[in-house]
Amino acid sequence: MVHPVQVGKRTRMSFGKVNDVTEMPNLIEVQLDSYEWFLREGLHEVFDDINPITNFTGNLVLEFVDYKLDMENIKYSVEECKERDATYAAPLKVSIRLQNNETGEIKEQEVFMGDFPLMTEQGTFVINGAERVIVSQLVRSPGVYYNYSIDKSGKKLYSSTVIPNRGAWLEYETDSNDVIYVRIDKTRKLSISILARAMGLGSDQELLDFFGEEERFRASIEKDNTKTKEEALLEIYKRLRPGEPPTVDSAISLIDTLFFDAKRYDLSRVGRYKFNKKLALNLRIANQVAATDIVNPQTGEIMVEKGQKISRLVAEEIQNAGVKSVDVLIEDKVIRVISNNFVDLKKQVSFDISDLGIKELVHYPTLKEILDNFSDEASIKEEIKKNISKLIPKHIIRDDIFATISYELGLTYGIGYVDDIDHLGNRRLRSVGELLQNQFRIGLSRMERVVKERMTIQDQEAITPQMLINIRPVAAAIKEFFGSSQLSQFMDQTNPLSELTHKRRLSALGPGGLSRERAGFEVRDVHHSHYGRMCPIETPEGPNIGLINSLATFAKVNEYGFIETPYRIVDKENGRATDEIRYFTADEEDQCLIAEAKEPMDENGHFINKKVRVRHLEDILVVPTTDVDLIDVSARQIVSVATAMIPFLENDDASRALMGSNMQRQAVPLLSPQAPIVGTGIEFKAAVDSGVLPKAKNAGVVTYVSGSEIRVKRDSDGGTDVYKLLKFKRSNSGTCINQRPIVDTGEIVYKNQVIADGPSTDLGEIALGKNIRMGFITWEGYNYEDAMLISEELVREDVFTSMHIEEYECEARDTKLGPEEITRDIPNVSDDALKDVDDRGIIRIGAEVRSGDILVGKVTPKGETELTAEERLLRAIFGEKAREVRDTSLRVPHGEAGIIVDIKVFTRENGDELNPGVNELVRCYIAQKRKISVGDKMAGRHGNKGVISRILPEEDMPFLPDGRPLQICLNPLGVPSRMNIGQVLEVHLGWAASHLGWHIATPVFDGATQPEITECMIKAGFREDAKTILYDGRTGEPFDNPVTVGIMYILKLHHLVDDKIHARSTGPYSLVTQQPLGGKAQFGGQRFGEMEVWALEAYGAAHTLQEILTVKSDDVVGRVKTYEAIVKGENIPEPGVPESFKVLIKELQALCLDIKVLNDEHEEVTLKEFVDEDMANLEVNIEGTEEIMVPEPDVLDDDSYDQNNDEDIDEIDYDESVDIADLETELELDDFNDEH
């Protein structure tokens, strides 16, 4: 039943029936943990991979010993970095040892290796002053994958791919004649036996003895024309290196570098783990019948007798006893199953090895050698440490290759299973740490090359580590990754939810991932393994659908990068759920039967029903309670945070829920946020983890509170913590970040308590919109097609008013003609235009500005022009050289307005770091209050979006029996066809709750049922059907039928009409066609397309049409004359020929068509072509002011280009005597044979 729950400072009445057994993990730990791992272990791994660097003779050895991030010497704090456009980073110091083997001399030095970007507490990076997020990438895990295709006769042809993290691929395929082929590194096919021979099994008999008598393998041997190991090696060499003379030695070294060299071939830890899991004996021989006795190689005891069935547990023992291969009997055929010979170390040694930290399986032959040669614990541990790279090889080994071939052979007989590439057990996450590690590795390997070169060139006696190291390649690799990688994204900072979702995003795109064009339907589709790991709902609509996903609420990422989800363990004996929680990866979960979280249980966790609904893979089954393995921890475990914030999600259609999840991320923070009356209970957790709320670092007592800072006296040592609040700062999306304290003086706070609200939060809960009194009623057609009718009250009371802050900057540079200057003294500007500009030439804070107003006065020197005689005379008399400058002030762009809230000035003199050539930089921040207006987009949380069609006076809105008018009218027809009934239930429950004075939590899939809502309605004193008689505000008459009225939570989205509306009279024109540019950003015009032309033709509006196609578009002369005529008030002249017509003629002439333009009298009309001088003669500048002009990419900014040419021309001495007739006119053929 409904019960109170304390959420932060607010009490909500919760309808949830499932008690959460486990805490939801920190929502941004996918970012924080990954980066922390990188600093702790990831960097070590890279340095270990590259160690040691030796020169070609081997007498100089350079080693990276240790590293540290120098946290004391961080240049600026996070806030300062944002202000100064700096990168938040710490210097990386590496201690390096250089050893000279000839002299035995050792030099150690600490070398600075560049600034390394640091992650903020919120899981973001500040790069050049902008907050960025590194999105995690979903990629295929390295490992071995088996698949099959079906040929024309319906036979299954098995194929397989061995995918390393980096290195050559191995692909096996079968043709319809049952011959198995292999491709090495995407080259031509070879028979599989050639590969096996090259790995050391020379003759046919050896091959058959090793792999067992198998028909397809025999067929492959017959197809193969090599008979010995050497021939096989040469054959492979010919395929891989065609055109080079094949020798056995070069073939052996080629195969070694391709597969067995850790620098060239890397399986990575994940790859090794997947390999061992797939190729181990236990899963392959379980439940099969043994064809021979299986003997333990160490003790000689018989583990399974011939003809016995091998159970799962025994299979596990066989695997860990180091048995290399097992013969099983299938339909009277003996099939040999070969493993890759890896065993569990714990089962092989008698003592405790937990201090070695080895979790993986180890290579049995290597281990056996160690155990045979050593007996005491200490030396065995020492040897294991020494040989760790052999015990757990990072590259592939011969045993792996034999096992993959054996697996391929066994598939035909049902031994083993094929893989599903879209299964989350085969896809893994590359998070920040790993992406950074890969980038750092690239930088280091480039540096390694430089170091080797320098070792050879420089004097070996005087050499020091510092001289060898060049940090440029490393710094460049890191910078490139943060600056331009597809996965390093500008943080979506519209509201706290959008920040949080951005950090939890999973992308299948990016380097090493898929591309939009190639991704098929299967990759994008929802898969059963997504359950509890990836949200099935939240994904963009459009070309990226299904490629960009969101992490589910309870999901975690394990050390291998696989996504895990928690389940409660069921005690099968007693049929009760324990409180033990375990995290499972997708392939571990596949064996289990999982009950849902809502399954009724008594207080001891015993199932109430005898039969239970469970999920197994993609099936839902009903089984007795004794068969249940696991139970979901929570009902919201399958969805992401944004989706979990939609109440009554279970009553919505999935595609509308998708829109609801996506639109919540676009909600603009309002002036006074309001938490939803009908919430889901996750709002508090989401706000706290998003990082927008200041939290108390230590427990204590609040001693001082103001709008901009909070002081807390610590309990531990009596010191004071000071928390500065952000006031009216601009976010990445141009919304306003403002924090307000929610604690009082004298209040006791505990550690990590929220002490202030941020943007879009209310008492520490996410509050994206407002609770609005609304009704489902049509009103005079203003609800047509999802439009919304709103009351003037929402405008007057600033219910949906939001703050937007735009940033404009102006820099004074050095030009070739002298420095630009920021000043109040601007030529040809009236005093009125400078009324708010101070004596520095910068606008004052608090001034109200409109488009075209000067923000920063700036003048740029102009080139000296030729003076006329009169001017020279005046100059001579008055002796002053007129300052030749032009006005290049920063003005408010077209269509913008607001109030100046902040000015920042950076100058060289103050020691600020500026770009080269910049002397001064001024930033202005303009804030606007945007009230809700017609054309703004609003939405509910259920995908019910619409545009405001009319703002009606309050007195005309339909009103309730108690006289209160509605605030919004929505169209009732928007509900049934879209099947998002959740909004109706929300309205009912909100109506009851607002009268009872409750805030409600109705968790997704575990929320209020219809009887419970009805009960609340009756408790609040309403009709059961929740309908009300409404009265028409214009006449006072009641409407014919009762109407559903209630409280709906409505958001104002970021698509505001003020940003979309746009007008142009004249402005920039395209270079070739001379037509106006398009789009608001380019200050372009509206395209009058073919359909619009048809409309005018149908009207017969010939003159309008002619005007649109000529003077309003690309008749260059005509448009200038028209402009003049309008200014002077004369009649508009006849249009000329449009430029695009001339372009068309030129294109036809380029096709060798002789085209002439004739007039009515059939006389040729010459089309004049314009050169720049003619353009200059068209005096009027109708391209708009210089600020609005879009710079053409080819045109240089300054005039230096033209001037240089003039000087060159002046220096040429013309030789008068040359006669043009004497010059050679014939082309000699030699001219063509010139090298150029």
Curated annotation (Swiss-Prot):
Keywords for the protein's UniProt record, in alphabetical order: DNA-directed RNA polymerase, Nucleotidyltransferase, Transcription, Transferase
Pfam families: RNA_pol_Rpb2_1 (PF04563), RNA_pol_Rpb2_2 (PF04561), RNA_pol_Rpb2_3 (PF04565), RNA_pol_Rpb2_45 (PF10385), RNA_pol_Rpb2_6 (PF00562), RNA_pol_Rpb2_7 (PF04560)
Record carries keyword Transcription: yes
Enzyme's top EC category: transferase
An example Gene Ontology CC term for this record: DNA-directed RNA polymerase complex
Position of the signal peptide: none
Coiled coil feature spans: none
Keyword Oxidoreductase: no
Biological process, per Gene Ontology: DNA-templated transcription
Catalyzed chemical reaction(s): RNA(n) + a ribonucleoside 5'-triphosphate = RNA(n+1) + diphosphate
Disulfide bonds: none
A molecular function (GO) term: DNA-directed RNA polymerase activity
CDD domains given in the database record: RNA_pol_B_RPB2 (cd00653)
Superkingdom in the source lineage: Bacteria
Compositionally biased spans, kind Acidic residues: 1194-1212
EC code: 2.7.7.6
Region described as Disordered: spans on this chain: 1193-1212
SUPFAM superfamilies: beta and beta-prime subunits of DNA dependent RNA-polymerase
HAMAP family linked: RNApol_bact_RpoB (MF_01321)
Family designation: Belongs to the RNA polymerase beta chain family.
Oligomeric and partner information: The RNAP catalytic core consists of 2 alpha, 1 beta, 1 beta' and 1 omega subunit. When a sigma factor is associated with the core the holoenzyme is formed, which can initiate transcription.
Biological function: DNA-dependent RNA polymerase catalyzes the transcription of DNA into RNA using the four ribonucleoside triphosphates as substrates.
Protein name: DNA-directed RNA polymerase subunit beta
Organism the protein comes from: Clostridium beijerinckii (strain ATCC 51743 / NCIMB 8052)
